[in-house]
Amino acid sequence: MSLMDPLANALNHVSNCESVGKNVAYLKPASKLIGRVLNVMQDQGYIGNFEYIEDGKAGVYKVDLIGQINKCGAVKPRYAVKNHDFEKFEKRYLPAKGFGLLIVSTPKGLMTHDEARNAGVGGRLISYIY
């Protein structure tokens, strides 16, 4: 059986592991997009270290959880957003203004919605976390 959305599955697994109090989550299958999303989450202080483990198939990410995530998930469909329209999606996906972040895929790479707004670029919404 194939996964329809590996990113949504990975973020849901992280959220579930965080809610039951686990210290480590193993995300399988691994992909470049999942790795980049984990990198943004680590830069913003939501997760600890993570590492890629080769298992002879698609690979596994081992993620150290630090108890900072209340909820995270993928945005479906992946809306195209202009740099001045982020506030509408903040109201939809985040509980309060200035709390949490949206992860956006831009021509300059994956970044948070605040970084994209400051850089003056738009993109597609990938996920949310708070």
UniProtKB/Swiss-Prot annotation:
A single GO cellular-component term on record: ribosome
GO MF term list: rRNA binding; structural constituent of ribosome
Pfam families listed in its UniProt record: Ribosomal_S8
Superkingdom, natural source: Archaea
The UniProt record lists the keyword rRNA-binding: yes
Disulfide bonds: none
Keywords: Ribonucleoprotein, Ribosomal protein, RNA-binding, rRNA-binding
HAMAP family (alphabetical): Ribosomal_uS8_A
Similarity-based family: Belongs to the universal ribosomal protein uS8 family.
Function: One of the primary rRNA binding proteins, it binds directly to 16S rRNA central domain where it helps coordinate assembly of the platform of the 30S subunit.
SUBUNIT field: Part of the 30S ribosomal subunit.
Protein name, UniProt field: Small ribosomal subunit protein uS8
Origin species: Methanococcus maripaludis (strain DSM 14266 / JCM 13030 / NBRC 101832 / S2 / LL)
Gene assigned in the entry: rps8
